[in-house]
Amino acid sequence: MKYLVLGLIATSLVTLTACTDKKETTPIGTNTPTEMIQEKPAEAVDFTELLGHYDHMTFALSSDNVEETAKAATGMLAALQKIEGAHFDAEQKNTYQDIAANIKENAEHIEDNIGDIAHQREHFVEISTDIYDLVQLFDISKPYYKVFCPMVNGGEGAFWLSSAKDFRNPYMGEKMLSCGSIQEELN
């Protein structure tokens, strides 16, 4: 019995000593450096060039200038290509790709229809919706104003974005240059 008690005490001491050993162990598969598993934060995407061409298009349409409108469309297409490589998070990337595809399609129509300002203006309605979505979804530092003209689209009206409170109507051009009202201030 004496040996049994001594054996139990010895076993207990060995067990206690083994349990207090502060050896650091790393489970299998978790030795990846922290920097590698952290997601890279999405960087602010610079839409300055794209928005500059949109402003150019707005001014050209308000001046009834089909050639300058087409040049602005060409500039928008080039700006879209530069943005493609930007760092977006997964949700932003999907949203941006949808918006960019719409802008591209409509800018190509505007670019290809130099002699038809009515057709250019029809596609400008769509581009304005997409630019509005971009300004809403992404951090755009420049203020914009959503301006509505009730006279467009057979009386349905349409909006565009203006970078200034003193806007020029791209839908009516020289006929009704100041037609419209600011509905919303963005940023």
What are these regions (language model features)?
Residues 1-4:
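Positively charged n-region of N-terminal signal peptides that target proteins for export
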Residues 20-38:
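Short, low-complexity, disordered segments immediately C-terminal to signal peptides
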